Amino acid sequence: MASSPVGVPSPQPSRANGNINLGPSANPNARPTDFDFLKVIGKGNYGKVLLAKRKSDGAFYAVKVLQKKSILKNKEQSHIMAERNVLLKNVRHPFLVGLRYSFQTPEKLYFVLDYVNGGELFFHLQREHRFLEPRARFYTAEVASAIGYLHSLNIIYRDLKPENILLDCQGHVVLTDFGLCKECVEPEETTSTFCGTPEYLAPEVLRKEPYDRAVDWWCLGAVLYEMLHGLPPFFNTDVAQMYENILHQPLQIPGGRTVAACDLLQGLLHKDQRQRLGSKEDFLDIKNHMFFSPINWDDLYHKRLTPPFNPNVEGPADLKHFDPEFTQEAVSKSIGCTPDTMSSSSGASSAFLGFSYAQDDDDILDS
């Protein structure tokens, strides 16, 4: 299992009173009591993800519920707001999770997201250990399409790993968790925050050098390597030794791989970000690599390609692809309670001004 993301110091809020105000945003008037919260399906540093059924129409959603106090204690509010911003910019790309609502109570933040129940790629890798090349190629292509789309919006993802790659009920990829995304990075610009998950950190991040969007292509290479070989490329249980391996150890590719797969891994996992595949033409470099020659990218984008694996879920209540560690946990009653006072002018609530969001009614009805 991958380590938790490396902690990142948050930028200081822009307002003198400590609030983060993103300006006016629509208020959906949503309440926790609008939903029946059925099962815990995931957990993170600051809260949980729950399967929820909307009472008004019976629609199922994945609701990410975050504790404001935990976020503020760790000075992570800017990253939570950045995650919301990235979700808002996703105009329904087929391989990115969609945000339907976001709202808040005085104690909690709520992201109402598309419900995806085919399981994490991590879950399937744990069970099957490794994938054959055609299956790994399919997932890598769909993830690359999603990353390329984020880059086109000047967003660097920065935390690509099997735990953040979900499968939908048909077996297509859905990329989720945008908490470490960096916005507003132009193609020639760099950033320098030390963040990510240890197994997938690029050398330039470890060296604390300025880095650009090529950092995501390193992570894609690490995930592809893990799909084909069962472990990340420079894995060691000793994190310090693993960092040393990432920085200095030559890439070792076990036998049995095609020439195209080996060439792609060597290109994506090049230690010099300036020479890495994707450093010149970004997603086009990946798209045009010979490893993906069997892929019709237009058919891929429009989901006209049959996924190599079907999760065979029997409807929204089928949770067999979720870790029982989560699904067997009791749902806290406080998650579904709507406090008498839904707003506050100070404290935790004021740090998340501008958080609430609702899609247009037409979008909600069409979903």
From Swiss-Prot:
Catalytic reaction equation(s): L-seryl-[protein] + ATP = O-phospho-L-seryl-[protein] + ADP + H(+); L-threonyl-[protein] + ATP = O-phospho-L-threonyl-[protein] + ADP + H(+)
InterPro entries: AGC-kinase_C (IPR000961), Kinase-like_dom_sf (IPR011009), Pkinase_C (IPR017892), Prot_kinase_dom (IPR000719), Protein_kinase_ATP_BS (IPR017441), Ser/Thr_kinase_AS (IPR008271)
Modes of activity regulation: Two specific sites, one in the kinase domain (Thr-193) and the other in the C-terminal regulatory region (Ser-356), need to be phosphorylated for its full activation.
PTM field: Activated by phosphorylation on Ser-356 by an unknown kinase (may be mTORC2 but not confirmed), transforming it into a substrate for PDPK1 which then phosphorylates it on Thr-193.
Protein name per Swiss-Prot or TrEMBL: Serine/threonine-protein kinase Sgk2
Organism, scientific name: Rattus norvegicus
GO cellular component, one term: cytoplasm
GO term, biological process aspect, one: intracellular signal transduction
Main location class: cytoplasm
Tissue and organ distribution: Expressed in the proximal tubule and thick ascending limb of the loop of Henle (TALH).
UniProt modified residues of type Phosphoserine: S10, S334, S356
Residue stretches making up the AGC-kinase C-terminal domain: 293-367
PROSITE patterns: AGC_KINASE_CTER, PROTEIN_KINASE_ATP, PROTEIN_KINASE_DOM, PROTEIN_KINASE_ST
Location of Phosphotyrosine modifications: Y357
Domain of life where this protein originates: Eukaryota
Bias (Polar residues) ranges: 15-28
A GO molecular-function descriptor: protein serine kinase activity
Segments for region (Disordered): 1-28
Family assignment from sequence similarity: Belongs to the protein kinase superfamily. AGC Ser/Thr protein kinase family.
Purpose: Serine/threonine-protein kinase which is involved in the regulation of a wide variety of ion channels, membrane transporters, cell growth, survival and proliferation. Up-regulates Na(+) channels: SCNN1A/ENAC, K(+) channels: KCNA3/Kv1.3, KCNE1 and KCNQ1, amino acid transporter: SLC6A19, glutamate transporter: SLC1A6/EAAT4, glutamate receptors: GRIA1/GLUR1 and GRIK2/GLUR6, Na(+)/H(+) exchanger: SLC9A3/NHE3, and the Na(+)/K(+) ATPase.
Cellular location(s): Cytoplasm; Nucleus
